[in-house]
Amino acid sequence: MVRQRKKRGRPVSGWVIFDKPKGMRSTEAVSQIKWLFHAQKAGHAGTLDPLASGLLPIALGEATKTVPYVMQGTKTYRFQIAWGEERSTDDLEGEITHISSKRPTQEEILALLPQYTGVILQTPPQFSAIKITGNRAYDLAREGKVVEIPPRQVEIETFKLIETPTRERSVFEITCGKGTYVRSLARDMGRDLGCYGHIADLRRTTVAPFCEDDLITWEELKAVALDKIAINENGIPSERNFTKIDELLIETGAALKCLSHYTLSETRAQ
């Protein structure tokens, strides 16, 4: 008889709408939240690049079953493109690969935006989690290999130029569907404008049905979870009372609010 392995942690369920800081990986954020809630199970609904900040929905327990629904939800990003340089990662982290002295005018940028609105074809960055013959594209890129990544359809519902604080940079906001790479937008727009570009700053503000009002920071979570609790020399709480921190969770069913609802007539319902 096979002995069933006992699950570690609490069977707590719900959503933490985490305000991920720059520099933290999405998987690291999940591990930290799982530890803080002492949850048996945890997962996130859409990776955010380490250099990006903002809304990262993290599901605990039974809420992990609703992750696919949230991943289908629309997302909003506010980002800054730095003109004049294209980089290997399409953001600040990579090496400079192309340089231009040209800077786009506001009129040129506005004229280009309609081409990037609606359903478009987009090629993901070389440094991405896309699998190529069983390997992650970013692993191959780190080995110096240039891989052929097929373009894919993505949908951008709205694309706004918010401001151009300097000739070097422009701030945008988009609402888009699943699978959209903002870094690819910076790369492709820079090429179309003849000046090159990369992402200088990126923040996600919504993942339907969650928004900025739902955000909570690591500092806020930690303050509630560890308030008046002794920490031993290994950084582990000596005793825990999860009542207060559990009150910060958004109910599991909230994830289903992004699903389409249909009204059936009595005849069709039968």
Swiss-Prot record:
Lineage: superkingdom: Bacteria
Classification via CDD domains: PseudoU_synth_EcTruB
Disulfide bridge map: none
EC number, UniProt record: 5.4.99.25
Alphabetical UniProt keywords: Isomerase, tRNA processing
Cited Gene3D superfamilies: Pseudouridine synthase
Record-annotated active site: 49
Catalytic activity: uridine(55) in tRNA = pseudouridine(55) in tRNA
Name of the top EC class for this enzyme: isomerase
Family affiliation: Belongs to the pseudouridine synthase TruB family. Type 1 subfamily.
Role noted for this protein: Responsible for synthesis of pseudouridine from uracil-55 in the psi GC loop of transfer RNAs.
Designated name of the protein: tRNA pseudouridine synthase B
Provenance organism: Bartonella quintana (strain Toulouse)
Encoding gene, per UniProt annotation: truB
